[in-house]
């Protein structure tokens, strides 16, 4: 016990390590060393930077690197280094590998006896191909021992295992009742609800990739979804609204009909274009038939709540804009989406009222 006048120490480290250990136990990867190492990985990835540049690599931990190729779609492996099974090796692996782990490259850490072997492996960066962690989310295989750690947003992480277990880890004060990936699925559904099969799933894949990248933006984002017959200009007081909305489904259909490099490049490029629009200030405007209608848009705010004895509205500018958009959902909008700087996400969708 601390002596009188000596501050007691409060640390979340042992709580995090304990929770990670329980997750790994459920994944048949028990042991205090691996629990401490993965907890170190979670803490480091939550706000990882090199030379003040934020990085968000996805890290896979396994006891057999061949599973990276045979189970989750990896293409080739590049070994980088080794070290004892301790947090220092995890920090070293991130230092050496994180700057290289972008686009199609991912970090792996392999348990071999008493050591960690680490390096990089390559996936397929084509936007219609599932990423390794998307494949991992879809499998439940007791014979495979593999977990992934991914930063979804600053201080918000996902733990995902090959035996079907998952956790969302919040190291911030963000509200946790609806994790961002679940909110994004509502937005994906809203933006594709009027896309006809068989293109719908591919359009959903493109939008999902772009929206997940959006979570790494430090400034937040806003999205409005119009119905197929919606007139963009009547909703917004300013913004860059396209005369001819970009038909993502049409680009995908053309790629499947003529799967050449030009068609593939067009699909890849429209995904990058959407990511750029989401990174811009203002509202990104989509249509529920899978079309991109505009970006950098703004709306008049409807009258909202004010602080007592003040004329100032509650919440920041994006939150007030989201309130204005939400008031139009079910009338002139199909959905409205809001993502804040602290990792909180919300989506209002007409499809919510159709659920039992």
For each predicted feature, which ranges?
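Divalent-cation
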Residues: 1-356
